[in-house]
């Protein structure tokens, strides 16, 4: 694998289709809070900030997610954690326990029999907690919409913050959904939801 060096950018791996990140997003370049903090530190030598702004900023860079992989979307979710997409570079690290997680990714077909388990796992997560619904089946039943055993959207069981469409959605779509969740947390805050 070679490296491509664009004229005004950093080195990009040759197999990444000319992109160093998804949609050209770099959290350190486009984060207004980070820009304000670094400017204030350069001017005064110290930082003053509201505690909830600081907590919100820290929380967006350290989201812990747990998987609730139910079908083929879980394969794409696993791919998003691998080195090519590397969700951990955005501060989005996996956890095995719901008690240590901030985000739950529901990926795949939710059946009536599995719905109580989904709700139980959601209730075990500490506040503030967020849910990403990944794929057509989790969003609204998808291909199995008319089946007697399928819940037509996981939002009937738990509140969903971000919907990632597709059947199955690509790993890039999930990374984009994670970035949208981080923007939503910055916009709404985390102390009171």
Curated annotation (Swiss-Prot):
Its cofactor is [4Fe-4S] cluster. InterPro entries: NADH_UbQ_OxRdtase-like_20kDa, NADH_UQ_OxRdtase_20Kd_su. Keywords: 4Fe-4S, Cell inner membrane, Cell membrane, Iron, Iron-sulfur, Membrane, Metal-binding, NAD, Quinone, Translocase, Transport, Ubiquinone. Its EC number is 7.1.1.-. It is found in: Cell inner membrane. GO terms for molecular function: 4 iron, 4 sulfur cluster binding; iron ion binding; NADH dehydrogenase (ubiquinone) activity; NADH:ubiquinone reductase (non-electrogenic) activity; quinone binding. The keyword Membrane applies. Gene3D superfamilies: 3.40.50.12280. [4Fe-4S] cluster binds at residues 72-73, 137, 167. Its main location: membrane. GO terms for biological process: aerobic respiration; electron transport coupled proton transport. One of its GO terms (cellular component) is respiratory chain complex I. Pfam families: Oxidored_q6 (PF01058). Binds 1 [4Fe-4S] cluster. It catalyses: a quinone + NADH + 5 H(+)(in) = a quinol + NAD(+) + 4 H(+)(out). It is a peripheral membrane protein. NDH-1 is composed of 14 different subunits. Subunits NuoB, C, D, E, F, and G constitute the peripheral sector of the complex. HAMAP family: NDH1_NuoB (MF_01356). NDH-1 shuttles electrons from NADH, via FMN and iron-sulfur (Fe-S) centers, to quinones in the respiratory chain. The immediate electron acceptor for the enzyme in this species is believed to be ubiquinone. Couples the redox reaction to proton translocation (for every two electrons transferred, four hydrogen ions are translocated across the cytoplasmic membrane), and thus conserves the redox energy in a proton gradient. Belongs to the complex I 20 kDa subunit family. This is NADH-quinone oxidoreductase subunit B. It comes from Caulobacter vibrioides (strain ATCC 19089 / CIP 103742 / CB 15) (Caulobacter crescentus).
């Amino acid at each position: 694998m070679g490296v491509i060096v664009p004229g005004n950018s950093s080195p990009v791996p040759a197999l990444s289709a000319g992109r160093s990140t998804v949609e050209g997003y770099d959290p350190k370049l486009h984060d207004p809070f980070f820009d304000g903090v670094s400017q204030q530190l350069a001017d005064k030598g110290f930082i003053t900030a509201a505690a909830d702004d600081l907590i919100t900023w820290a929380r967006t860079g350290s989201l812990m997610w747990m998987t609730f992989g139910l079908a083929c979307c879980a394969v794409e979710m696993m791919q998003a954690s691998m080195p090519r997409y590397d969700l951990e570079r955005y501060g989005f690290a996996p956890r095995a326990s719901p008690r240590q997680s901030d985000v739950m990714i529901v990926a795949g077909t939710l059946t009536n029999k599995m719905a109580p388990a989904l709700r139980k796992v959601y209730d075990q997560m500490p506040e503030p907690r967020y849910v990403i619904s990944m794929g057509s089946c989790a969003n609204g039943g998808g291909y199995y919409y008319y089946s007697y055993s399928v819940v037509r959207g996981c939002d009937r069981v738990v509140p969903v913050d971000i919907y990632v469409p597709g059947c199955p959605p690509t790993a890039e779509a999930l990374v984009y959904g994670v970035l949208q969740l981080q923007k939503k947390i910055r916009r709404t805050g985390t102390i009171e939801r």
